Amino acid sequence: MDLKEQIVEILNTIIGEDISDQMDDDFFENGLLDSMATVELLLDLESKFNIQAPVSEFNRDEWNTPNKVVAKVESLIG
């Protein structure tokens, strides 16, 4: 499973639905993620990919779509 598939799987679990066909849809505008789910997402991504994504440095505009989450994780991995 590649990075994108792994991230989509994490998102699907947190959101509770398949978002693989909504890769550019805004989680927050669509009410799919709230603050608690966002913290859960960051913790899951940190654990799975051994990255640091502190909540204190979270910029919603950089994490608001599945494609942006993938890009952000890729940038944090190296």
From Swiss-Prot:
Coiled-coil stretches: none
Associated pathway: Cell wall biogenesis; lipoteichoic acid biosynthesis
Cellular component terms (Gene Ontology): cytoplasm
Any one of the GO BP annotations: lipoteichoic acid biosynthetic process
InterPro entries: ACP-like_sf (IPR036736), DltC (IPR003230), PP-bd_ACP (IPR009081)
Compartments, record wording: Cytoplasm
Full protein name: D-alanyl carrier protein
Organism of origin: Leuconostoc mesenteroides subsp. mesenteroides (strain ATCC 8293 / DSM 20343 / BCRC 11652 / CCM 1803 / JCM 6124 / NCDO 523 / NBRC 100496 / NCIMB 8023 / NCTC 12954 / NRRL B-1118 / 37Y)
Gene: dltC
